[in-house]
Amino acid sequence: MKHILPYWHELPDLDLYLDQVLLYVNQVVNSQESLEQNCLSSMKINSSLGNEADDRTGVHQGKLTTDNVDFRRVLTAAMINNYVKHKQIEKPIKKKYQKHQVARLIALTILKNVFSIQEISQTLNLLLNSSDSESLYNHFVDCMRDKENEKTPDIIRFACQSVKLYYKTRQLTVDLERSQHES
């Protein structure tokens, strides 16, 4: 089954309890195919001098793979409780989380490997001054799928590139360790 980050309209319409949120978010972000598809498989980067950089991003053309590297990110109940306590996500209503909270948790879980939770929350709050959660989340999914367009805010575009570069660096580290153990 091919699993990629869901768009807003694909997120659950029903409000979810904490255990359901944990199951759903972890399932979405932990799928190896999702990570390969969204973070690495079609990312544009190559260090060869012959390639021209994209004018908008400065990133070169190329292809990346994960080679079965385990890049799982885990979201726990304690993390969600801390996010609520520190106002990084809204408090659940009658212990139920709504679609915008689930979308924010997916983004936080993916971005937290590169940026601090405070940086992510501050940036999301600033972006929400000029756009809505649905549009911002869909731009994020587009970027992770390498389908961004001219309406995609640069801050989202560069955040996604940072995540992809982080995973490429992790992949290179694993490959280096593997080659050193084999020699």
Question: Where does each model-flagged region fall?
Answer:
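Basic helix-turn-helix/winged-helix DNA-binding cores
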Residues: 1-121, 125
